[in-house]
C-alpha cells in the first residue's frame, strides 16, 4: 500500500503495519497495561499495629460512663490506624511483545484510515524557537499534533516544550497512549521506515 507524503511522491509501506484491521480489545488491553505500568504504587498507610503509641488500655472497662476502649490506636479514634491500610504495590501488567507490536500496528492503521497520519519528507526547524514551530504547524493546518522523527531533533524538542498540544518523539519513544492522545500524528518518511523495521 502507499501513503501520501506532503509535497513529495507517495511512500510504499507494508500492509501488515499500516493496513491492519482495528483490534479495539487488544488496543484497550495494551493501553490499560501501559497506564498501569506508569503508576508509582508507593502509597503507604499504617494499620493499628504500626501506629506509634501506647498499648495501655486508656481507662478501665466499666464504671466510667464512657464507651469502652482498649487501645488508643483503634481505627475509630483520631490518629488511630487505618482499617485496611494501603501498602506499596506493583501495578504493572504483563504484555507480550507480539501483543504490544500488534496494538501499535492497529493504532497506526486506524490513524491512516481516519486520515490522522500526516507523512512528511522531513520535519525540522533552524532554531529552537516556539514561534517558528507554531508557524510550521500552521502551514500544515495543525495545532494538536504528535511529531515523530527518525532521531530526536533537539531544536524541535526544545521548541515544542512550551506547547500544550504538541509533543516530539523519536521512533524509540512512541507508545500507544501518545499515538491516540493527539488529533494528528506527523511522521517523517525516515521514521516510517524505522517503524516498519521495528515492528517487523
UniProtKB/Swiss-Prot annotation:
Residues 43-71 are annotated as: Disordered. Pfam families: Ribosomal_L4. It comes from the Bacteria. InterPro entries: Ribosomal_uL4, Ribosomal_uL4-like, Ribosomal_uL4_dom_sf. Gene3D superfamilies: 3.40.1370.10. The keyword Flavoprotein does not apply. The keyword rRNA-binding applies. GO terms for cellular component: ribonucleoprotein complex; ribosome. Keywords: Ribonucleoprotein, Ribosomal protein, RNA-binding, rRNA-binding. One of its GO terms (biological process) is translation. One of its GO terms (molecular function) is rRNA binding. Belongs to the universal ribosomal protein uL4 family. One of the primary rRNA binding proteins, this protein initially binds near the 5'-end of the 23S rRNA. It is important during the early stages of 50S assembly. It makes multiple contacts with different domains of the 23S rRNA in the assembled 50S subunit and ribosome. Forms part of the polypeptide exit tunnel. PANTHER family: 50S RIBOSOMAL PROTEIN L4, LARGE RIBOSOMAL SUBUNIT PROTEIN UL4M. Part of the 50S ribosomal subunit. This is Large ribosomal subunit protein uL4.
Amino acid at each position: 500500500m502507499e501513503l501520501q507524503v506532503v509535497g513529495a511522491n507517495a511512500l510504499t509501506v507494508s500492509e501488515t503495519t499500516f493496513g491492519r484491521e482495528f483490534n479495539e480489545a487488544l488496543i484497550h488491553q495494551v493501553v490499560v497495561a501501559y497506564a498501569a505500568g506508569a503508576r508509582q504504587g508507593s502509597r503507604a498507610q499504617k494499620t493499628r499495629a504500626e501506629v506509634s503509641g501506647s498499648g495501655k488500655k486508656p481507662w478501665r472497662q466499666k464504671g466510667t460512663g464512657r464507651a469502652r476502649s482498649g487501645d488508643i490506636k483503634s481505627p475509630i479514634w483520631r490518629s488511630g490506624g487505618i482499617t485496611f491500610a494501603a501498602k506499596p504495590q506493583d501495578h504493572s501488567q504483563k504484555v507480550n511483545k507480539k501483543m504490544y507490536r500488534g496494538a501499535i500496528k492497529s493504532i497506526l492503521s486506524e490513524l491512516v484510515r481516519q486520515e490522522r497520519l500526516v507523512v512528511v519528507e522531513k520535519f525540522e526547524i533552524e532554531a529552537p524557537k516556539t514561534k517558528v514551530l507554531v508557524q510550521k504547524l500552521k502551514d500544515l493546518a495543525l495545532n494538536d499534533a504528535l511529531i515523530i522523527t527518525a532521531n530526536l531533533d533537539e531544536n524541535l524538542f526544545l521548541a515544542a516544550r512550551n506547547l500544550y498540544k504538541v509533543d516530539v518523539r523519536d521512533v524509540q519513544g512512541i507508545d500507544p497512549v501518545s499515538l491516540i492522545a493527539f488529533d494528528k500524528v506527523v511522521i517523517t518518511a525516515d521514521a516510517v521506515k524505522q517503524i516498519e523495521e521495528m515492528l517487523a
